[in-house]
């Protein structure tokens, strides 16, 4: 089993009025040259959690951090106009919370962060600020919900 020390939360960057099945997600990732879905888990709007990549297989979800991380993606992340927004349904919120806590029981040394929290600290102040984000993903403050961060 590989060493896991990071859980990274993502959004699929799909509009709130659209759906993206696990099969659609897999197809999108294959078109980008990956050998399947890069995330380990995918959470649908109804809260269903799909295992999309075995945990023992290195993910393809955040360059430079894949070897020792688990990627979780929720369906959504954009409002109906295509702007970044926390579009999680109550069912997604609950499923994400349960999944992260289950993974923290299995990997207690893990830190939990959002994809954007792994952006480079361009001004060197020790904090990743909105103007430094490479992308807005997952469109909510992961550290506020899970109390840990990548720093």
Language-model region placement:
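Basic/polar, cationic surfaces and motifs that engage anionic cell-wall
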Residues: 1-8, 12, 45-49, 66-68, ...
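Short amphipathic alpha-helices and their capping/turn segments at secondary-structure boundaries
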Residues: 56-63, 101
């Amino acid at each position: 089993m590989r060493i896991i020390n990071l859980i990274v939360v993502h959004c699929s960057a799909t509009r709130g009025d659209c759906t993206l099945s696990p099969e659609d997600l897999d197809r999108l990732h294959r078109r980008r040259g990956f050998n399947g879905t890069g995330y380990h888990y995918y959470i649908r709007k109804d809260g269903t959690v799909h295992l999309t990549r075995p945990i023992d297989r290195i993910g393809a979800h955040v360059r430079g951090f894949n070897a020792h991380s688990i990627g979780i993606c929720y369906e959504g992340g954009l409002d109906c106009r295509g702007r970044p927004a926390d579009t999680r349904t109550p069912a997604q919120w609950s499923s994400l919370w349960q999944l992260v806590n289950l993974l923290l029981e299995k990997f207690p040394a893990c830190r939990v962060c959002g994809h954007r929290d792994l952006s480079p600290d361009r001004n060197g102040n020790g904090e990743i600020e909105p103007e430094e984000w490479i992308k807005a993903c997952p469109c909510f403050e992961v550290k506020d919900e899970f109390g840990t961060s990548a720093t």
